[in-house]
């Protein structure tokens, strides 16, 4: 089960809950805590990351990235014309937008969104003498990078890995900050009902679609334009996680710019030689130029009104590109009862619909804590989004009880 698949992307999350779990009559084991994400219900994301859907082309990423009258620029993982779905794609798009903006006569710059692409651009522009204001709808920076420590260790609710460390700009940044990185290996086991070990030859055919497509692209193979990925290339080398969470990397992007939190933008208008940005609090700000780093999912919702309206090629790109979904459920127990020395655990025989709680990441192997995390991606993740926390955790525990029978 090779974790470096063609479409491998980052992750993303909306925290749904953290509470001690209350056992019920059907629960054989009791976690001491949990973290659940629900990115499709996040009004500032509406999904995890982009993919090239059927009917879309790679050129749609270029169209999304193109500027409007050299005043409104676009950045984000979906606005990267050569690679998408990863944190380094977001970082590089922010650098690209900053370079484009530095080529014009714009002293004051507004940046919509304080995720990786927005802060990457802000750092570059402020370092070149521009007056930069970042407007962020959330009460925190980071966007789809979100590190949470309420279980004790740092766990990433959103993006988790540097995908390919060779020549990756994030490798250089993390080296400069002396951040501790942990390589994750490809060791795996497929556990069936009653804990039996299922050989590769006997694993169900649909399992690869779940682990290598739904959990990479955030979409099903039937939704993806696979031809668009044939000549896709990205950085090589191992994938690594951060011991203390991905959010540490933002220390490198500090700079002489202003960040306004809880500032939800709802309009962007070209007026004269400038750009007026309106917010839901009724305020408006004028800039010489702006960089829009809103996630593709938010652009699809039309939450921000553009005046004049976006050009047709850009609107079509927003419509045709797909917004994938990858959600996580972290479970913390008093002790490890699963395979302690294996990284990836597949659980296809859990009496749930295909794609639900079929893949797990064993954190105990890397941080010496009894924590295991489930992935749910693509259509199954959308199906699960409406469940309560209790229903979600019950399905997770049902799966673990079948794969590792108590007693």
PLM regions: where:
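FAD-dinucleotide binding site
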Residues: 1-407
């Amino acid at each position: 089960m090779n974790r470096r698949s063609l479409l491998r992307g980052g992750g993303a999350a909306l925290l749904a809950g953290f509470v001690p779990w209350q056992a019920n009559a059907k629960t054989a084991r009791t976690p001491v805590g949990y973290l659940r994400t629900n990115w499709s219900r996040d009004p500032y994301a509406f999904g995890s990351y982009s993919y090239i859907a059927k009917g879309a082309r790679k050129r749609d990423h270029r169209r999304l990235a193109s500027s409007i009258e050299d005043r409104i620029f676009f950045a984000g993982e979906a606005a990267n014309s050569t690679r998408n779905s990863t944190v380094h794609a977001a970082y590089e798009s922010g650098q690209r937008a900053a370079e484009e903006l530095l080529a014009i006569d714009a002293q004051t710059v507004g940046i919509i969104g304080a995720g990786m692409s927005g802060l990457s651009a802000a750092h570059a522009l402020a370092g070149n003498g521009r007056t930069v204001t970042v407007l962020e709808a959330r009460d925190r920076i980071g966007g789809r990078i979100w590190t949470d420590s309420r279980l004790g260790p740092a766990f990433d609710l959103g993006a988790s890995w540097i995908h390919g460390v060779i020549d990756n700009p994030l490798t250089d940044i993390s080296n400069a900050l002396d951040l501790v990185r942990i390589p994750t290996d490809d060791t795996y086991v497929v556990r069936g009902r009653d804990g039996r070990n299922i050989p590769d030859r006997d694993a169900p055919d649909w399992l690869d679609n779940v682990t290598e497509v739904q959990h990479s692209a955030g979409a099903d193979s039937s939704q993806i334009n696979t031809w668009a990925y044939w000549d896709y290339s990205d950085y090589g080398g191992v994938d690594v996680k951060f011991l203390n969470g991905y959010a540490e990397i933002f220390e490198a992007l500090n700079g002489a710019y202003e960040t306004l939190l809880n500032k939800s933008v709802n309009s962007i208008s070209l007026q004269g030689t400038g750009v007026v940005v309106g917010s839901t609090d009724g305020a408006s700000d004028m800039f010489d130029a702006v960089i829009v780093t809103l996630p593709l999912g938010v652009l699809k919702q039309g939450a921000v009104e553009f005046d004049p309206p976006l050009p047709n090629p850009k609107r079509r790109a927003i419509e045709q590109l797909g917004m994938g979904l990858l959600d996580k459920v972290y479970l913390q127990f008093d002790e490890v009862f699963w395979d302690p020395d294996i990284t990836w655990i597949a659980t296809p025989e859990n009496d749930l619909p295909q794609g639900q709680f079929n893949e797990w990441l064993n954190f105990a192997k890397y941080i010496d804590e009894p924590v295991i995390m489930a992935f749910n991606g693509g259509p199954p993740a959308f199906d699960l989004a409406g469940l309560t926390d209790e229903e979600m955790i019950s399905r997770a525990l049902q799966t673990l009880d079948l794969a590792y029978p108590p007693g």
